[in-house]
Design a protein with these regions (language model features):
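Cell-envelope/extracellular polymer assembly enzymes that use nucleotide-activated donors
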Residues: 2-4, 35
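Acceptor/aglycone-binding surface of glycosyltransferases and processive sugar-polymer synthases
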Residues: 53, 62-68, 72-82, 87, ...
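Hydrophobic helical membrane-anchoring modules
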Residues: 180-317
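Short, well-formed alpha-helical segments that are part of the catalytic scaffolds
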Residues: 12-27
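Short beta-strand/loop segment that forms part of the nucleotide-sugar
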Residues: 32-43, 64-65
Length: 317
């Protein structure tokens, strides 16, 4: 199979027939063998009924229904697990991503040898309340990830070599930074293609609000930390813990040595426990020990942890 199109969705019933018809036309015009995987992420507006109707009309349509809304990352990951095509295309269901871009994205993967190609919505039809934070996000993501040639990390329209989606785990809210996940997995040939951005035709965006932007930055910092220290938590926690314990131990030793010297020379000296420095040294030793144990436990957890996605599938077609 040439192409798998993975479409995560939440309450997009109005747009689904038009979305599939557009994809179907592009696929037929270019002679691609394909499948379209709709991942219904807990929709409450009848989206699943529409997907079932599309499935009855076309063997190319597959559907996955979650028991509740889990988020875009688990929906994408579930679609990736089911995808069979040599090239996997992701796009949103809201008609803002153009299926006419599929042939160009496919060629960049198959003929130019890219592992991942991300769309770049150079001209956007979003309000400034969304575009301005997006620019800040992308600038920060480029800096932290080291992927200098991408301008739109969160673009829903992307193309992947099949091996990429089978070797990354998209969990939490990490869908924004899939190129970073791919790079960390060893897929370094990452490209970009300027794509059309359509104005939303049906409904309103489900992803507005301050929390979206705050969570985006927190996710990026989490991803940086995990990619740097995730395999060896002891490297960071053990190091910090050892430094703090050593400083506390040296301070306590000096306080004790000073007390013994004063006793040996019959110099009046208050009790060690009366000194605030003693408690400061003790606190540093305790915190150092806790950090060291945190690193140890982190190592154990990282070795025993497996899949971090806990979504439940209610039905598949």
């Amino acid at each position: 199979m040439d192409i798998s199109v993975v479409i995560p969705l939440f309450n997009e019933a109005e747009s689904l027939p038009e979305r599939f018809a557009w994809i179907e036309r592009v696929m037929k015009e270019n002679g691609f063998s394909y499948e379209v995987i709709f991942v219904n992420d807990g929709s409450t507006d009848g989206s699943w009924n529409v997907i079932c109707e599309l499935n009855k009309k076309s063997d190319h349509v597959k559907g996955i229904k979650f028991r509740r809304n889990y988020g875009k990352s688990p929906a994408l990951y579930c679609g990736f697990e089911q995808a069979q095509g040599d090239v996997v295309i992701t796009m949103d269901a809201d008609m803002q991503d153009s299926p006419d871009e599929i042939p160009g994205l496919y060629r960049m993967i198959k003929e130019e040898g890219y592992d991942l190609v991300s769309g770049y919505k150079q001209k956007r039809y979003d309000p400034i309340s969304k575009t301005l934070p997006t620019k800040l996000f992308n600038a920060t993501a480029r800096k932290i990830s080291g992927i200098k040639n991408l301008h739109d990390f969160n673009c829903g329209l992307k193309a992947y070599r099949k091996a990429v989606v089978k070797n990354i785990e998209v969990y939490g809210e990490m869908h924004r930074y899939i190129p970073y996940l791919a790079k960390n997995a060893g897929f370094n040939k990452i490209g970009e293609k300027v794509v059309q951005h359509q104005a939303r035709k049906y409904g309103a965006s489900k992803f507005m609000g301050l929390n979206r932007f705050v969570n985006g930055y927190l996710d990026l910092l989490t991803l940086w930390f995990l990619s740097t220290f995730g395999k060896k938590p002891m490297h960071v926690f053990g190091f910090l813990g050892s430094i703090m314990f050593f400083i506390g131990f040296v301070a306590a030793f000096c306080i004790g040595a000073d007390k013994l010297w004063c006793l040996a020379n019959h110099i009046p000296q208050r009790l060690v426990t009366d000194s605030p420095y003693f408690y400061l040294a003790l606190t540093m030793m305790i915190i150092g020990t806790q950090l060291f144990l945190t690193g140890f436990l982190g190592d154990l957890i990282s070795r025993s942890s497996t899949n971090r996605n806990d979504y439940q599938i209610e039905e598949t077609i």
